[in-house]
From Swiss-Prot:
S-S bridge residues: 4-39, 6-32, 22-40
Pfam families for this protein: Defensin_4
Family, similarity comment: Belongs to the sea anemone type 3 (BDS) potassium channel toxin family.
Key words, A-Z: Disulfide bond, Ion channel impairing toxin, Nematocyst, Neurotoxin, Potassium channel impairing toxin, Secreted, Toxin, Voltage-gated potassium channel impairing toxin
Keyword Transmembrane attributed: no
KW Disulfide bond (keyword) present: yes
A GO term from the CC aspect: extracellular region
GO MF annotation list: ion channel inhibitor activity; potassium channel regulator activity; toxin activity
Name this polypeptide is given: DeltaKappa-actitoxin-Avd4b
Role played: Acts as a gating modifier on both Kv and Nav ion channels. Voltage-dependently inhibits voltage-gated potassium channels Kv3 (Kv3.1/KCNC1, Kv3.2/KCNC2 and Kv3.4/KCNC4). Slows inactivation of the voltage-gated sodium channel Nav1.7/SCN9A. Inhibits all Kv3.1, Kv3.2 and Kv3.4 by about 50% when tested at a voltage of +40 mV. May act by binding residues in voltage-sensing domains S3b and S4 of Kv3. Tests have been done on human Nav1.7/SCN9A and rat SCG neurons that mostly carry Nav1.7 channels (EC(50)=300 nM). This toxin also reduces blood pressure.
Superkingdom per UniProt: Eukaryota
UniProt subcellular location: Secreted; Nematocyst
Length: 43
């Protein structure tokens, strides 16, 4: 996934293109929506 950044997060996340939710099984704990993509943390 491409790197992305959310406000208030010190590290980068994974950018998932054209998704409204983060996929399961990757250990993501938080996210922020960047229409039409989503940024999932931690990468």
């Amino acid at each position: 996934a491409a790197p992305c950044f959310c406000p208030g997060k010190p590290d980068r996340g994974d950018l998932w293109i054209l998704r409204g939710t983060c996929p399961g099984g990757y250990g993501y704990t938080s996210n922020c929506y960047k229409w039409p993509n989503i940024c999932c943390y931690p990468h």
